[in-house]
Amino acid sequence: MLMPRRVKYRKQQRGRMKGKAKGGTFVQFGEWGLKALEPAWITAQQIEACRIAMLRVMKRSGKIWIRIFPDKPYTKKPPESRMGKGKGNVEGWVAVVKPGKILFEVAGVDEETAHEALRYAASKLPIATKIVPRHHIGGEAV
């Protein structure tokens, strides 16, 4: 699973997911990308499930870029515990995703395989997504 090696503070506040993504909104490395259309927390387990699903479709050919990283800890209190008595223990790690963010990129496979791989990855995620191509302006990739 993806998670930070070390963090300055063990626990974080939840925060808010207002507005659109500031960076990482264009396909930069691959030929096709999977773009988020809704805000959400994507867990490390969901990212790993997407990665495995894409590898299975692509039959280990081509290349995959994961453009998000789960750097936010989320906590949970034990079952049947009363309220109060401090914040719960860290349960896992999540990536905060805003609309417009590119989640995954694919290259080195034909268009049909890339679409199928990204469609399989999208089925593993709890948000609406769309498949976007890399933009070429004047014969040069942007």
Swiss-Prot record:
One of its GO terms (cellular component) is cytosolic large ribosomal subunit. Signal peptide: none annotated. InterPro entries: Ribosomal_uL16, Ribosomal_uL16_bact-type, Ribosomal_uL16_CS, Ribosomal_uL16_dom, Ribosomal_uL16_sf. SUPFAM superfamilies: Ribosomal protein L16p/L10e (SSF54686). GO terms for molecular function: rRNA binding; structural constituent of ribosome; tRNA binding. Belongs to the universal ribosomal protein uL16 family. Part of the 50S ribosomal subunit. This is Large ribosomal subunit protein uL16.
